[in-house]
A protein has these predicted regions:
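Glycine-rich helix-loop-beta junction characteristic of Rossmann-like nucleotide cofactor-binding loops
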Residues: 66-70
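Non-catalytic C-terminal accessory region of glycerolipid acyltransferases
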Residues: 4-5, 133-246
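A transmembrane-helix-recognition feature enriched in membrane-embedded lipid enzymes
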Residues: 2-62, 114-118
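Short acidic-hydrophobic, aromatic-tinged amphipathic segments that line or gate anion-handling sites
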Residues: 63, 121-125, 218
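Catalytic core of membrane glycerolipid acyltransferases/transacylases, capturing the structured
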Residues: 25-33, 40-43, 56, 71-128
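Generic preference for hydrophobic
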Residues: 63, 77, 100, 210-212
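Short gly/ser/thr-rich secondary-structure transition/capping motifs
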Residues: 56-64, 131-132, 192-195
């Protein structure tokens, strides 16, 4: 597929997402007025918009589970980050209500803004005050038995093809303080469909392969999020990533 066609495909994808967002906007506007009451509705619309957008342009998701997942409990979902499609992957994957924690710049995006003003958690990483507020919101969310999705690398890799980079500790401190199980998610090849925001290489139809590893407990023995928890999650995700991305 030529770069020109990939650019056309990218514009088609963005157009599809915008179309479904505008289609659902009257409902979103209403639900956003009282997000605590309509949390599940907002999560549902976020999922519907993102999945409808990829289906229209021929992108599919295939998930392989290392062990069966009990979606009746909440998790801290830790996923690698190589593409804006990673958000859609987690919307597809998580069967229970959850919030994203993401960079504050997502408040500038006309589509993600309404979600990061209501159900998702924006954080300005270079601000200690913003980071603390986001941390407290995340703990409150988990205490309400909702799940939280975090990309522990902190950003999409600047290099192509991408690698799995060392994790930041935030996700593991949050999980340990609330003793919430971590669910490692390895998104193997979203970057081959659409790397980063697509501006460099465009996008194309295809299947995104995802490996969900066995949940990892952050029990009482790990109250302070010892480096061993972070290292264990990273090692297992790195191993799964390397098997697919040789």
């Amino acid at each position: 597929m030529t770069r020109f066609l990939k650019k056309i495909h990218l514009y088609a994808y963005f157009t599809a997402v915008l179309f479904f967002f505008l289609l659902g906007y009257p409902f979103l506007f209403y639900y956003a007025r009282t997000p605590q009451k309509y949390y599940r509705k907002l999560v549902l619309f976020r999922r519907w918009i993102s999945l409808a957008g990829i289906y229209v342009v021929g992108i599919r998701i295939h998930v392989e589970y290392e062990t069966p997942i009990d979606w009746s409990q909440n998790y801290v979902l830790c996923a690698n980050h190589t593409s804006i499609l990673d958000i859609t992957v987690l919307n597809y994957l998580c069967k229970s209500p959850f919030s994203f924690m993401g960079k504050i710049e997502l408040l500038k995006n006309p589509i993600t803004r309404i979600f990061f003003q209501t159900i998702d958690i924006p954080v300005k990483r270079d601000s200690k005050i913003s980071a603390f507020k986001a941390y407290k919101r995340a703990l409150e969310l988990l205490q309400k038995e909702k799940s939280l999705a975090i990309f522990p690398e902190g950003k999409i890799d600047d290099d192509y093809p991408p690698m799995l980079h060392p994790f930041k500790s935030g996700a593991f401190r949050i999980a340990s303080e609330n003793r919430t199980t971590i669910l490692p998610v390895v998104i193997q090849d979203a970057w081959q469909i659409l790397w980063d925001d697509g501006k460099t290489y465009g996008s194309k139809p295809g299947i995104i392969h995802v490996k969900v590893l066995a949940p990892i407990s952050s029990d009482a023995e790990r109250d302070k999020a010892s480096p061993s928890l972070e290292a264990e999650v990273y090692h297992k995700m790195k191993k799964a990533w390397n098997i697919y991305n040789k």
